[in-house]
């Protein structure tokens, strides 16, 4: 059993480090993880669930605003992008946050094609991040179920 736990912990460390190296996460995610303790073991997953729910709503709102035969309200799209950027920044979703910067620039320039392209990229990145984090949380659960302790991963 100890060998299994050690293997799962190694997998967890390697996987987590890869999420930072690939740019999915930044230091803000590390700070978020530090807020989790024994009294609130699901804190991070709950915060991320709320983040992903917000992503769905904001992406849907932006898609509706851009899918119009009339005039696009770029200020409305920009406001949603700004909100998504803030949310992604607060949870350490680096790729999503970075895309939001470009998306905001397209809104300010009233660049319809750029906005549509950025929306598609944001949608892809948020879904990829969600899948990656679900995999990470599954590894955490496996470690705990095997009787182990989820290791702290030092990224610096």
Curated annotation (Swiss-Prot):
The modification Phosphohistidine is found at residue 82. Functions as a two-component phosphorelay mediators between cytokinin sensor histidine kinases and response regulator (B-type ARRs). Plays an important role in propagating cytokinin signal transduction through the multistep His-to-Asp phosphorelay. GO terms for molecular function: histidine phosphotransfer kinase activity; protein histidine kinase binding. One of its GO terms (biological process) is phosphorelay signal transduction system. Keywords: Acetylation, Cytokinin signaling pathway, Cytoplasm, Nucleus, Phosphoprotein, Stress response, Two-component regulatory system. Strongly expressed in flowers and roots. Detected also in leaves, siliques and stems. Interacts with the B-type response regulators ARR1, ARR2 and ARR10. Binds to AHK1, AHK2, AHK3, AHK4, AHK5, ETR1 and CKI1. CDD domains: HPT. Induction: By salt, cold and drought stress. Residues 40-147 form the HPt domain. Histidine-containing phosphotransfer domain (HPt) contains an active histidine that mediates the phosphotransfer. The modification N-acetylmethionine is found at residue 1. The gene is AHP2. One of its GO terms (cellular component) is cytosol. This is Histidine-containing phosphotransfer protein 2. It is found in: Cytoplasm, Cytosol; Nucleus. PROSITE patterns: HPT (PS50894). It comes from the Eukaryota. It comes from Arabidopsis thaliana. Two-component system major event consists of a His-to-Asp phosphorelay between a sensor histidine kinase (HK) and a response regulator (RR). In plants, the His-to-Asp phosphorelay involves an additional intermediate named Histidine-containing phosphotransfer protein (HPt). This multistep phosphorelay consists of a His-Asp-His-Asp sequential transfer of a phosphate group between first a His and an Asp of the HK protein, followed by the transfer to a conserved His of the HPt protein and finally the transfer to an Asp in the receiver domain of the RR protein.
